[in-house]
Amino acid sequence: MNVFLSKYVNGVDKKSRVSVPANYRAVLGKELFNGVIAYPSIRNNCIEVCGISHIEKLRQMIETLDPYSEERDAFETMIFGEAVQLSFDGEGRVILPQSLMKHAGIEEQACFVGKGVIFEIWQPQNFEKYLNAAQKIAHEKRLTLRNAH
């Protein structure tokens, strides 16, 4: 399967290392880079994480915007300027930069949340609050997911 699924909570050690779930690493196995790209979410107080191929798709979308627009500049700055390449160590861990941990409020635990083509890393209690709100929205908007066939 080529999508990020499920939710996992893993500990963050004193060196800011955290283990990326094995099935997430399996999804990334086809990427050219043995690691992930992480950047601060522009929607939530979490970290968005993806492979190089998804960053390329984001680049293509952003390049459709006027090259001198505020929107393009903001997206390039927030996604590309703040992005970091995180390599996997021999145990499947990455080192989370302090700037990203601060953005997400992560200290001792990290909650990995599969979102299809990306995954997010949250402070666990913050994710539970978001999940409660998302459940309400999904319930209210459930009819927008209609079968296209």
Curated annotation (Swiss-Prot):
Residues forming coiled coils: none
Localization in the cell: Cytoplasm, Nucleoid
GO cellular-component term (any): nucleoid
Gene3D superfamilies: Transcriptional regulator MraZ domain
Organism: Rickettsia africae (strain ESF-5)
Quaternary structure annotation from Swiss-Prot or TrEMBL: Forms oligomers.
Family (UniProt): Belongs to the MraZ family.
Domain SpoVT-AbrB: from-to ranges: 7-54, 83-126
Record bears the keyword tRNA-binding: no
NCBIfam families: PRK00326.2-1
Name used for this protein in its record: Transcriptional regulator MraZ
Signal peptide range in chain numbering: none
Pfam families associated with the record: MraZ
HAMAP family (UniProt xref): MraZ
Keywords of this entry: Cytoplasm, DNA-binding, Repeat, Transcription, Transcription regulation
InterPro entries: MraZ, MraZ_C, MraZ_dom, MraZ_N, MraZ_sf, SpoVT-AbrB_dom, SpoVT-AbrB_sf
Gene: mraZ
A biological process from GO: negative regulation of DNA-templated transcription initiation
Keyword DNA-binding on entry: yes
One of the record's GO molecular function terms: DNA-binding transcription factor activity
